[in-house]
């Protein structure tokens, strides 16, 4: 049974279909639930109204409105911290940066676990990955490898030539799409979101596994991996009973979702295992150059000179590198796509960016990494994009012990949901119109705010122990790609005076729904 045969992906429709025959049990469970929550000695955060037995507040999210937007509207009613129940999971929703700071400083250790999903468990190595391993010695060892060996500033500098090589290759392909200069004075159409996806995936795959050319015209192995990852992302968007009501997890088997995910997982694992073995064979034959040393090589170095955590070293290598590919490619693609969309809808901002580039770089050479510190407005554009359209609009954690947040008791096992999207649109922090795209705010009133997780009013990469370890790498890549795009090409919408559709998707990542079709032509005098 293929997943496409599932009649609906709307949680309420599915729940009604399967739960109506057991309505008597719902009444019994409701009585138990009401009795258990009556504890006058503890002050709990207010709970959103409308909750139901077993399904909790799921039915409120069945109207098609995106989860982060729905939760943002609920925060306007219940305040910056409130409780909600996603099925059987009690969840504390926080939309205020000061309360989030308390969670990720005072209570950071207690909120250091991430609840997984069916897709994460079956397709992305679950508790064996640095992204979802439970807090403890094993996770700390994995995290140390990621931050000190794979993504340290020294390592990023060491692999800069690999990144530059892939970026240059992708820009050459963009010039080729325009026509190698044969259409002098004319614009050519480009699917910009696809090109950005190829670029970021190529860069990350090169530095992680030494793989090149993941575009549609790439080699068969590259296309196979890209197809598997696209399928995994598609399956992740399906509603899974296991994620909200574990006792109904058997329905995911009945619907064929588990089988589809396991099939996809087998394909991904097979490819990752092949990559690891290819690296091992190359090393043993003495054909591995230090200049081409990628993340898999670094992990194998660690295996040779000490040891990797866990009982299966190859599993650690595969899961760590898969985490790097997932975290480094999609987030960057999503952010750059939103940045270009916003700039096309705000031509005055686009013009200001071009003026900065012409002043600092000129039109006789390409932008270099060394130029970025002199391009504060380009940097501000990335910040403002991630403020308005964070790639991951919600951050999820789970508390290991009872704790207190904003004066409210939070029982052990409660899930924490930080509404980054809502929090970063706070008019008390971002003066003027917080919903307006104004990069210059990061050069004036919010100039001291950065993306490294220490300023809680802007945390698109997360914060605390679980902050994304690849912040520096991702930001450097985004700055360079955006600067080069704006510097080297005139870019317009296909239809003059037509606004780019800014409709966004829900789920783990906030994708732009409609393709970003643009017209380009070169603008440099070289």
Swiss-Prot record:
Its cofactor is heme. Keywords: Heme, Iron, Membrane, Metal-binding, Monooxygenase, Oxidoreductase, Transmembrane, Transmembrane helix. InterPro entries: Cyt_P450, Cyt_P450_CS, Cyt_P450_E_grp-I, Cyt_P450_sf, Plant_Cytochrome_P450_Monoox. SUPFAM superfamilies: Cytochrome P450 (SSF48264). It catalyses: (S)-cis-N-methylcanadine + reduced [NADPH--hemoprotein reductase] + O2 = allocryptopine + oxidized [NADPH--hemoprotein reductase] + H2O + 2 H(+); (S)-cis-N-methylstylopine + reduced [NADPH--hemoprotein reductase] + O2 = protopine + oxidized [NADPH--hemoprotein reductase] + H2O + 2 H(+); (S)-cis-N-methyltetrahydrothalifendine + reduced [NADPH--hemoprotein reductase] + O2 = 7-hydroxy-8-methoxy-11-methyl-17,19-dioxa-11-azatetracyclo[12.7.0.0(4,9).0(16,20)]henicosa-1(21),4(9),5,7,14,16(20)-hexaen-2-one + oxidized [NADPH--hemoprotein reductase] + H2O + 2 H(+); (S)-cis-N-methyltetrahydropalmatine + reduced [NADPH--hemoprotein reductase] + O2 = muramine + oxidized [NADPH--hemoprotein reductase] + H2O + 2 H(+). GO terms for cellular component: membrane. Its EC number is 1.14.14.97. Optimum pH is 8.5. Mainly expressed in roots, and barely in stems, leaves and carpels. GO terms for molecular function: heme binding; iron ion binding; methyltetrahydroprotoberberine 14-monooxygenase activity. The gene is CYP82N4. This is Methyltetrahydroprotoberberine 14-monooxygenase. PROSITE patterns: CYTOCHROME_P450 (PS00086). It comes from the Eukaryota. It is a single-pass membrane protein. One of its GO terms (biological process) is isoquinoline alkaloid biosynthetic process. The keyword Disulfide bond does not apply. Optimum temperature is 30 degrees Celsius. It comes from Papaver somniferum. The keyword DNA damage does not apply. Repressed by cytochrome P450 inhibitors ketoconazole, metyrapone, prochloraz, ancymidol and cytochrome C. Belongs to the cytochrome P450 family. Heme binds at residue 468. It is found in: Membrane.
